[in-house]
Amino acid sequence: MKPYLLSAKQLIDKVKKSELSSVDVANSFIERIEEFEKDVRAWAFFDKTSFLEKAKEADDWRLSGKPLGPLHGLPIAIKDIFKTEDMPTGYGTPIKEGQRSKNESEVVR
């Protein structure tokens, strides 16, 4: 079973049942991105290390017994038109390439 082929609901269910960890899901998506990114060029910025760290944090949170949101552990992508504190926000143009923000867009929080 390849997690990147599952629907969001299937991923969430498998993570909640501990059939998959968030790190398992992240590694599956990383494998897929690395396989096709050179041809597809879908990512303006991709930080594999941060992705894996956040997946580990999601797993730790889940295992701690703390309350979870309905999408907890599900990977998301943030289009580079939204300001983020820890990623460049290029607005899809070379003029803004590498630009960093000191605050985050509301949709990112």
Question: PLM features: residue spans?
Answer:
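Residues within well-ordered alpha-helices
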Residues: 10-11, 106-108
